[in-house]
């Protein structure tokens, strides 16, 4: 019993430099004898600093961590739920999505003659009634011309006003830029001195002998090349 009690006795903290007593066991038998072990020399103990103690206390306990957020909770909304009814949007849905089309059929088909907005069954003016019950006539059918096709109607009569205006081509606008009328400054009145100066210049040009000679030479050249000149005709006959 002494041997078993020695195993479960709490060991006292060992003091550095002292001998430690370790129980030994051989096989299935335990002996209460103690062996003295030689102390192992180690580094001198260092006292923990206050900063290291504070850091260790601040550090969280090491453990496993994951990079996943928390999964969303279960919600009552599923694909089978009508969201318009769920959020009470029936009024706004009927306001924006349930509008009646105010545009008439004639707005989409303006080239068709006649009143196409009203059905043609009351007065038998529909195309189906014309096919099912063709009119009885003795004359053969003749192809309609282009002018007649434009005004073709099932009932004889004038075209409605809305169709008359369709075939009238509006006048084309002329893309001419409006010329801006520049304000012309009134010319200053001529003084008698200016008019006298211009007259003097004209007289000087006319009196210049060189200008007179040039004019005479030009007249001579013109008269030589003209067919009425007698010298030109004699020279041409001599060459022949």
From Swiss-Prot:
Chief location bin: nucleus
InterPro entries assigned: Mediator_Med19_met
UniProt KW Nucleus keyword: yes
Chain positions covered by the region annotation Disordered: 32-58, 169-240
Chain's gene name: med19
Described purpose of this protein according to its UniProt entry: Component of the Mediator complex, a coactivator involved in the regulated transcription of nearly all RNA polymerase II-dependent genes. Mediator functions as a bridge to convey information from gene-specific regulatory proteins to the basal RNA polymerase II transcription machinery. Mediator is recruited to promoters by direct interactions with regulatory proteins and serves as a scaffold for the assembly of a functional preinitiation complex with RNA polymerase II and the general transcription factors.
Name the record gives this protein: Mediator of RNA polymerase II transcription subunit 19
Family: Belongs to the Mediator complex subunit 19 family.
Keyword tags: Activator, Nucleus, Transcription, Transcription regulation
Organism in which the protein naturally occurs: Xenopus laevis (African clawed frog)
Biased composition (Basic residues): 170-181, 212-224
Organism lineage string: Eukaryota, Metazoa, Chordata, Craniata, Vertebrata
Subunit structure: Component of the Mediator complex.
Keyword Amino-acid biosynthesis found: no
Localization (cell): Nucleus
A GO BP entry: positive regulation of transcription by RNA polymerase II
Cellular component, GO, one term: mediator complex
GO molecular-function terms, A-Z: transcription coregulator activity
């Amino acid at each position: 019993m002494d041997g078993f009690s020695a195993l479960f006795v709490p060991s006292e903290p060992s003091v550095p430099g002292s001998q430690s007593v370790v129980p030994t066991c051989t096989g299935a038998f335990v002996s209460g004898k103690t062996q003295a072990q030689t102390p192992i020399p180690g580094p001198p103990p260092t006292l923990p600093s206050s900063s290291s103690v504070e850091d260790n206390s601040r550090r969280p306990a090491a453990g496993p961590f994951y990079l996943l957020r928390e999964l969303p909770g279960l919600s009552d909304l599923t694909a089978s739920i009508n969201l318009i009814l769920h959020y009470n949007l029936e009024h706004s849905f009927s306001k924006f999505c349930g509008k009646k089309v105010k545009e008439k059929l004639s707005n989409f088909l303006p080239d068709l003659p006649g009143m196409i907005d009203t059905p043609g069954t009351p007065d038998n003016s529909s195309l189906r009634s014309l096919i099912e019950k063709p009119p009885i006539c003795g004359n053969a059918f003749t192809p309609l011309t282009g002018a007649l096709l434009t005004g073709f109607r099932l009932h004889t009569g004038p075209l409605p006003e809305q169709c008359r205006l369709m075939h009238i081509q509006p006048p084309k606008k002329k893309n001419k830029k409006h010329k801006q009328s520049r304000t012309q400054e009134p010319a200053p009145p001529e003084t008698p001195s200016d008019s006298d100066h211009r007259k003097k210049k004209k007289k000087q040009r006319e009196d210049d002998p060189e200008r007179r000679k040039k004019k005479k030479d030009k007249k001579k050249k013109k008269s030589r090349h003209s067919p009425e000149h007698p010298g030109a005709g004699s020279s041409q006959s001599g060459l022949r």
